[in-house]
């Protein structure tokens, strides 16, 4: 039976450390500031933005939310990004995804100054990530690596299989796992013989947003299973992994909720602090 990878506990420990780092920055006369641009009324986006704001306030990080109407023009969004890029008090900047259809998400993200790109989504920072020369990492991917480190799960030489190829989780996590000398495969909706491939994984990560799609017969005995999915089924939150049966086969497994989710917001705040330190020559 698998042991639990407790992301909630690690997130709490990290929060204590981050609070001290913010205090240290303020002793140097530096105040971290995160600006979030949210366009429209997507309910999930509003929940995520509020969660970030609560955490930022708790740590002493100033967060400013630019809540724009759903019919906002792309030109006006780009002008706002330009003004925030030019503001020396703004240490980090992000656009909450998804954006309304009249706005090209790629163009908007590309406009962000890479030095303030807290989500690590600009082409320049994605390139640095794959080169192993990055100064910022996507929060969820960084949180997963930290969770594995915390439980002393070595990636060297391991077969790591990631189900999901998003720019937010799957692809950046693959880059970070390669840095740790894992052999990495990325699977997706068009991958053939999915179960045959997942059964080869020493470390299996699922990040597709499909409730309980990973069944016990798709998992190798003794595998480490990381569930990034958050899905609501019959009023309850479940992951992409069929938790109870898979737990019987895994050596380690993340629960949902309480696994990867709590780490994402904490690591976003860590990236804010890292960018702030870098911009002021304190890294």
From Swiss-Prot:
It comes from the Bacteria. This is Bifunctional protein FolD. The lineage of its organism: Bacteria, Bacillati, Bacillota, Bacilli, Lactobacillales. GO terms for cellular component: cytosol. The gene is folD. Gene3D superfamilies: Leucine Dehydrogenase, chain A, domain 1, NAD(P)-binding Rossmann-like Domain. Belongs to the tetrahydrofolate dehydrogenase/cyclohydrolase family. Keywords: Amino-acid biosynthesis, Histidine biosynthesis, Hydrolase, Methionine biosynthesis, Multifunctional enzyme, NADP, One-carbon metabolism, Oxidoreductase, Purine biosynthesis. It catalyses: (6R)-5,10-methylene-5,6,7,8-tetrahydrofolate + NADP(+) = (6R)-5,10-methenyltetrahydrofolate + NADPH; (6R)-5,10-methenyltetrahydrofolate + H2O = (6R)-10-formyltetrahydrofolate + H(+). InterPro entries: Aminoacid_DH-like_N_sf, NAD(P)-bd_dom_sf, THF_DH/CycHdrlase, THF_DH/CycHdrlase_cat_dom, THF_DH/CycHdrlase_CS, THF_DH/CycHdrlase_NAD-bd_dom. Signal peptide: none annotated. Its EC number is 1.5.1.5, 3.5.4.9. Pathway: One-carbon metabolism; tetrahydrofolate interconversion. GO terms for molecular function: methenyltetrahydrofolate cyclohydrolase activity; methylenetetrahydrofolate dehydrogenase (NADP+) activity. Homodimer. Catalyzes the oxidation of 5,10-methylenetetrahydrofolate to 5,10-methenyltetrahydrofolate and then the hydrolysis of 5,10-methenyltetrahydrofolate to 10-formyltetrahydrofolate.
């Amino acid at each position: 039976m698998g042991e639990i990878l407790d992301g909630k506990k690690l997130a709490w420990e990290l929060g204590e450390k981050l609070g001290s780092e913010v205090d240290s920055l303020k002793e140097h006369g530096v105040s971290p500031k995160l600006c979030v641009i949210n366009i429209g009324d997507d309910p999930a986006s509003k929940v995520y933005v509020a969660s970030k704001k609560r955490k930022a306030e708790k740590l002493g990080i100033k967060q400013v939310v630019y809540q724009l109407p759903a019919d906002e023009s792309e030109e006006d969004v780009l002008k706002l990004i330009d003004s925030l890029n030019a503001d020396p008090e703004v240490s980090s900047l992000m656009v909450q995804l998804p954006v309304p259809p009249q706005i090209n998400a790629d163009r908007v993200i590309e406009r962000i100054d890479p030095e303030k790109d807290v989500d690590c989504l600009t082409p320049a920072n994605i390139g640095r990530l794959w080169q192993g020369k990055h100064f910022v990492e996507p929060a969820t991917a960084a949180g997963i690596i930290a969770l594995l480190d915390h439980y002393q799960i070595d990636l060297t030489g391991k077969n790591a299989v990631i189900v999901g190829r998003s720019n937010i989780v799957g692809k950046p996590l693959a880059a970070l796992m390669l840095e740790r000398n894992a052999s990495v495969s990325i699977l997706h909706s068009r991958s053939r013989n999915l179960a045959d491939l997942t059964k080869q994984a020493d470390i299996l990560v699922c990040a597709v947003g499909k409730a309980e799609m990973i069944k016990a017969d798709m998992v190798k005995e003794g595998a480490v299973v990381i569930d990034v999915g958050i899905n609501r089924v019959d009023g309850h939150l479940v992951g992409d992994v069929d938790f109870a049966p898979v737990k019987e086969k895994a050596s380690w497994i993340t629960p949902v909720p309480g696994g990867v989710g709590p780490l994402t917001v904490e690591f976003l705040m860590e990236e804010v602090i890292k960018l702030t330190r870098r911009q002021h020559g304190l890294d």
